[in-house]
Amino acid sequence: MMDFSSVKRIVIKVGTSTLAHNTGNLNIRRVSKLIEVMSDLKNSGKDVIFVTSGAQGVGAAKAGLHSKPKEMPKKQACAAIGQCELMHIYDREFANYNHTVAQVLLTRDVISNKTRKENVINTVSYTHLTLPTNRE
């Protein structure tokens, strides 16, 4: 097992296959356990950045669809629905450990634009008292 005792910042990336059951519905037990582990890392003094995708799949399930849509407008609608659902659950679960979450939306255009990229870096740096949650 690797020794992470000297590591200051830990980035944890999860996607739909980790967050959801095969039905597309959230695996609440798994999400809760993941947040418990991240909160413990945060409590031990680590900076934790949680990068999560899966909004589209979660949104499709919440909208009653049996699969992710193919058309862009439906994809966008499902992502919007799913993002609200994910952030609601993350906020609720992290609150159990007295941690505040912040959302930073990461897209290719944000990373490729110098000013936007600096804004993201500043936000993540400033939120040293929170556990930032990012979506790719």
What name fits each language-model region?
Residues 18-20, 55-59, 111-112:
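Short, active-site-adjacent cap segments at secondary-structure transitions
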Residues 127-136:
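Conserved small/polar residues in nucleotide/adenosyl-binding loops
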Residues 48, 91-104, 129:
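Short, flexible active-site-proximal loops enriched in glycine and acidic residues
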Residues 1, 86-95, 119-126:
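Short, charged beta->alpha transition segments
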Residues 74-78, 106-115:
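Flexible, glycine/proline-enriched loop segments at strand-loop-helix junctions
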Residues 11-13, 47-59, 101-103:
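Short beta-strand segments at enzyme active-site cores
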Residues 1-49:
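N-terminal glycine-/serine-/threonine-rich phosphate-binding loop
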